[in-house]
Each structure stands twice: as C-alpha cells, then as structure tokens.
C-alpha cells in the first residue's frame, strides 16, 4: 500500500506552526510496516490545493490530508476535493445536529460559517469527530482514497487512531511485528554502530531498522515481516537489550518520568528534590505523571546560596570553599532534600545554565547532579552544550535517569 500525507495551511509554510501531525502518523504507520513515501505541504490556495490533491491521489493508494476543515474563509479542503471529483458539496444533517448541540452546550447559536464544517463532497463518508467540531471525511479519488481530517493535533490523532489506522490495518495482507527500545543519551551514530551485527545478520533479512534521536532519547526501531514475525522480533529485542544494557530506559510508549514514578510507587518510596539551575523542572516532569503525589515528597528551588543554607542545610563553609556549582554542593542539596522531606531518596542539581556566569574552570553548561539514597550518595558531573533552556532540560532529564538507575 502506497501512503502519502498532504497537509494544508498557510501557517505551516510561514513557520508560525510546526506540523507535528505528520511525523506522528508516519511513526504509527511504520509500526504497520508502511513507510510514507511523500509528504506535501500546500498553502491555503484553491489552485495549489486542487493540483496537490490530483497529484497525490494519482500516485498513492491512500492520501491522508490534514487542515482546511474549519469554519473560516481559508478552510478549503471540502471545496477543493469536491472540485477535483466534479461533484457538489452537500449538507450533512447529522453533523449539523451535532454542531448545534455542541454550540448549545456553550450557550451559543450555530452561525452560518460554522455550518460550513458540515458540508462535504457528494458521496463522501463522514467520520464523526469526538474531540472537536469539524468532522473528517473520506472519499475515493484517483487510484485510491483520500481521508480529510482536521489539523488540530488532538482531533487528528484521535481520528487516525479511530479510523485511519484500522482502515489501513484491515487492508494489509499481513501486519508485521514491531519493536521499539528507548536509549538514554546515546548518540544516534553510536546506536547505529552498535546495532550493525544485528542488522547484518542474515537471519534478519527483510527486517526494517530505524533510528530517531531527540535528546535525551534515541529510539531504535525494527519492523519484521513474514512468517514467525513475532518470534523474530522477540529475538531481535533480546539482542538489543543485551547490547545496550542499562542505557535502555524503556520500550514502546514508556516515558522516563512515568517509569521513575512507577518504580518509586512499586517500592513504596518517595523522593525529595533540591533543585537550583533547573528551577523546578524535575518537579514539573514528575508532577505531570498521574500518581506522582504518592511518590514526590517535596521540591525545593534553592537558587540563592542563602536559600541553600537556610532551607536545605548546605553548610556555608562548603559554598565558600567549593562554590555553588560543585560536586560537594550537589551532594549536600540531595542529602538536604532527603532529610527535609524524610524521603527515601533525594536529588540535588546545581549548574551554570548561561548564557553568562561561566569561567575557564567552570564554563557554561557545567552541571553537578547527585542522588542520595539508603545506601549513600552518587554524584556525576556533566558539561552540556546548548542555550540556557537546553542545558536546564538536559540536567532535569539526567537527574531522572540517575534516579532511575539508583532504583534498579
């Protein structure tokens, strides 16, 4: 099956909005063994949009289109698909009623421009939208089918999960087995080099391997077709886990903060945080996870030296002798947070996020991290690159990973 993606919207071409829908769908289709062959971006222009619909549907069995489904003058998708088919737009009464009820709940009357969202090319199958006001639709065009979806990410992804992916899966002669392992802070090139024996193994002929690097994660993926796909995928997984060991922090949809919360909860333990340069980012990452209240005791942003002394008990002489950005102070922050919270674990972070404040001995990007636990305190020093935000985020995720390793 040949699949293409067509996204429309001036905002995507002016840089005002980044298209996150297409990469998400590409990733989901990869799990079905399909690689999207082309992605096309088109402005809100009738001529360009009609031409793009004709071009993509001439090549692909399925074109997934996003955007242009709303109530405004520049929402042109339904109109342009109808023009390509040479059919009129027709009012879809069930969608009108859904819109009326939606507006009624907000105490508003349905306006004529919003009714535009319920007009579709004659013969189209309407796809109800439980996440927003604009339904999607699908209709045969060219050699295959076009599916038109709203561009709002939560709506797009919901409709893909509910309609597009099941539609694709039902038309595949076989669904391959897939695997995904997530590595912490492993460069993509290193992962590729380490994976060469697996990729070059004749037993893995026909297996599609892929990588995705987005700091602090590098994803290693594989899709296995054919007979015994599940068994072959499982054997690859065992080899990958053996190659990377503790650098593997999760699989599939695992996220680092979720795993840390889950491990703490499974042990019945809590953590306390003593943050400086990260300004509460570690606490933010943890509290975004449902159930964090059971494992997070306290989070202190001790930015000034006086606060480090007063709140977390960092000795003044330690600060004077080593400076705020140092291994002893990171250790004291972690131990002070653990003591203040009465928690099993304490995390301490101190660093220079920049852009100023660095010295030849301690350049911008220098960060010291510590994890204090029942068996003592472990510390690490890091030299991060990037702007202020990137340094802080790297440090926050590094702290979570150190805690993950301590909880193993």
From Swiss-Prot:
Classification via SUPFAM superfamilies: CinA-like (SSF142433), Molybdenum cofactor biosynthesis proteins (SSF53218)
Gene3D superfamilies xrefs: CinA-like, MoaB/Mog-like domain
Family: Belongs to the CinA family.
PANTHER family tied to this protein: NICOTINAMIDE-NUCLEOTIDE AMIDOHYDROLASE PNCC, NMN AMIDOHYDROLASE-LIKE PROTEIN YFAY
Identification of the protein by name: CinA-like protein
């Amino acid at each position: 099956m040949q699949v293409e993606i067509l996204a429309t919207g001036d905002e995507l071409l002016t840089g005002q909005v980044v298209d996150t829908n297409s990469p998400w769908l590409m990733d989901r289709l990869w799990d079905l063994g399909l690689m999207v062959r082309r992605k096309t971006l088109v402005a809100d222009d009738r001529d360009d949009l009609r031409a793009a619909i004709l071009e993509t549907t001439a090549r692909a069995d399925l074109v997934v289109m996003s955007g242009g489904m709303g109530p405004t003058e520049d929402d042109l998708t339904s109109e342009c698909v109808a023009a390509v088919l040479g059919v009129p737009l027709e009012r879809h009464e069930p969608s009108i009623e859904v819109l009326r009820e939606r507006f009624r709940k907000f105490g508003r009357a349905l306006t004529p421009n919003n009714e535009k969202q319920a007009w579709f090319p004659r013969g189209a199958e309407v796809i109800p939208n439980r996440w927003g006001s604009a339904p999607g639709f699908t209709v045969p065009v060219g050699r295959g089918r076009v599916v038109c979806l709203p561009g709002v990410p939560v709506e797009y992804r919901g409709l893909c999960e509910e309609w597009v992916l099941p539609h694709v899966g039902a038309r595949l002669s076989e669904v391959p087995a897939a695997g995904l392992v997530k590595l912490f802070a492993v460069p993509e090139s290193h992962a590729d080099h380490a994976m060469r024996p697996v990729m070059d193994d004749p037993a893995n002929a026909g297996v599609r391997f892929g990588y995705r690097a987005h700091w602090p994660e590098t994803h290693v993926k594989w899709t296995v077709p054919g007979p015994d796909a599940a068994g072959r995928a499982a054997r690859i997984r065992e080899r990958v886990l053996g190659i990377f060991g503790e650098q593997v922090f999760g699989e599939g949809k695992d996220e680092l903060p979720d795993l840390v919360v889950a491990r703490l909860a499974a042990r019945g333990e809590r953590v306390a945080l003593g943050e400086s340069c990260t300004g509460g980012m570690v606490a933010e990452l943890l509290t975004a996870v449902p159930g964090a209240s059971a494992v997070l005791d306290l989070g202190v942003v001790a930015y000034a030296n006086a606060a480090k002394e007063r709140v977390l008990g960092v000795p003044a002489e330690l600060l004077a002798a080593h400076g705020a950005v140092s291994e002893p102070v990171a250790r004291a922050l972690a131990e002070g947070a653990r003591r203040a919270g009465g928690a099993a674990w304490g995390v301490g972070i101190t660093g220079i996020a920049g852009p100023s404040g660095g010295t030849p001995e301690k350049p911008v990007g220098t960060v010291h991290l510590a994890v204090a636990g029942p068996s003592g305190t472990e510390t690490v020093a890091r030299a991060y690159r990037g702007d202020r935000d990137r340094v802080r985020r790297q440090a926050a995720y590094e702290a979570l990973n150190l805690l993950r390793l301590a909880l193993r």
